[in-house]
């Protein structure tokens, strides 16, 4: 497996008095600003999650380096009596509003306990910012208005984690990828299925999309295709030994049956991965206008050796490339962002990922040409 050279690599969150998990990254292109979020935990376990932290990075397009500011706690992203988990940033380019979605889980009640008892103590929340994350609104609990009575049909649920999506349609629709463990008849355990929360009015109201087939958990979405052929692509964690993908022809409301993506391997219990769409940088006559990039551990036995994969035909699950290695050792969750053109003229990406056995969360920056030089050499 080839190793990818990088433009920059820097540890942003380091375990000490606190642990850090679940990275989320968003790039605000006009401001040339990166916002890196993570859960700050009392220990590494889910039950000891507490609040979110944020580091703000200023990207210098001349030096191709990011200067990071000190860590700050996002105190507004907190629902009393609950712990904040799964940060999901979303930027509405039309209203210039930054959303931070997350789940709030009561006390120290674990996901396992909710699955065993069928008692859902998880809430859907968000905060917003109109100054690119410098100040934030008070928290809003969207559970009753968005999920309603369906909440009691789920043993628990989650969002993302990681970046969300604004569609290129007229409404500028907003999508928050999510998953829920739906309760089954008494002899069956709750089963996970992915879906999206949708807004067609810039976040004033939200609705539930319909579920993808079972065996789909933590997920991310991207928009691929052109014109009337645009579809929402969903890539999800599974326990099937490989990722699953599904596509929606109607802005994330309905998804066709999922497909197993055998080239994107999963460890036995699965792991979160990140997917992002970006404009096709080549001039090939038969090239589609959007490609996909994906990051995830490359080992089918355990969470180790973070790789990046490329798909030049996004809807075909058989056309994913072999991975290029981004980081060695125990690596887990990651989040990708497209940062425009890099110094070599090819698309540039930022990646925030868990490293060193969950001891640190690292930011690295690389170009498509660094990761997949053969793509450009073949032109």
UniProtKB/Swiss-Prot annotation:
Name of the protein in question: Sialidase-2
Subcellular location: Cytoplasm
Catalyzed reactions: Hydrolysis of alpha-(2->3)-, alpha-(2->6)-, alpha-(2->8)- glycosidic linkages of terminal sialic acid residues in oligosaccharides, glycoproteins, glycolipids, colominic acid and synthetic substrates
Binding residues for substrate: 21, 41, 179, 181, 218, 237, 303
Organism: Cricetulus griseus
GO CC annotation: cytoplasm; intracellular membrane-bounded organelle; membrane
Underlying gene: NEU2
A Pfam family it matches: BNR_2
GO biological process, one term: ganglioside catabolic process
E.C. code: 3.2.1.18
Annotated BNR repeat ranges: 127-138, 197-208
GO-annotated molecular function: exo-alpha-sialidase activity
Motif (FRIP motif): 20-23
């Amino acid at each position: 497996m080839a190793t990818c050279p990088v433009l920059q690599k820097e540890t942003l969150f380091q375990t000490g008095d606190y642990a850090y998990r679940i990275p989320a990254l968003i790039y605000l292109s006009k401001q040339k600003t990166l916002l890196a979020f993570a859960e700050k935990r009392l220990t590494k376990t889910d039950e000891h999650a507490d609040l979110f932290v944020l580091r703000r990075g200023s990207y210098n397009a001349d030096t191709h380096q990011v200067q990071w500011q000190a860590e700050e706690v996002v105190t507004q992203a907190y629902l009393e009596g609950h712990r904040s988990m799964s940060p999901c940033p979303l930027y509405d380019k039309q209203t210039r509003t930054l959303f931070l979605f997350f789940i709030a889980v009561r006390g120290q009640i674990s996901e396992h306990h909710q699955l065993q008892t069928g008692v859902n103590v998880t809430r859907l929340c968000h905060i917003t910012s109109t100054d690119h994350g410098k100040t934030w609104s008070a928290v809003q609990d969207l559970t009753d208005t968005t999920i309603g009575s369906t909440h009691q049909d789920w043993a628990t649920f989650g969002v993302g984690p990681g970046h969300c999506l604004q569609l290129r349609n007229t409404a500028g629709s907003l999508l928050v990828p999510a998953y829920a463990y739906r309760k089954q008849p008494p002899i069956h355990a709750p089963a996970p299925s992915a879906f999206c929360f949708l807004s067609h009015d810039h976040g004033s109201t939200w609705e539930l999309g319909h579920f993808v087939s079972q065996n789909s958990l933590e997920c991310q979405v991207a928009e691929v295709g052109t014109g009337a052929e645009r579809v929402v692509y969903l890539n999800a964690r599974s326990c099937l030994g490989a990722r699953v993908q599904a596509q929606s022809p109607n802005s994330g409301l309905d998804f066709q049956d999922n497909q197993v993506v055998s080239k994107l391997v999963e460890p036995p219990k699965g792991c979160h991965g990140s997917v992002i769409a970006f404009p096709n940088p080549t001039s090939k006559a038969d090239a589609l206008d959007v490609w996909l990039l994906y990051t995830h551990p490359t080992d089918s036995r355990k969470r180790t050796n973070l790789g990046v994969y490329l798909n030049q035909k996004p809807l075909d699950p058989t056309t994913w490339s072999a991975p290029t290695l981004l980081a060695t050792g125990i690596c887990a969750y990651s989040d990708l962002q497209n940062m425009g053109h890099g110094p070599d003229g090819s698309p540039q990406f930022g990646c925030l990922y868990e490293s060193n056995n969950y001891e640190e969360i690292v930011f690295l920056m690389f170009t498509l040409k660094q990761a997949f030089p053969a793509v450009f050499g073949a032109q």
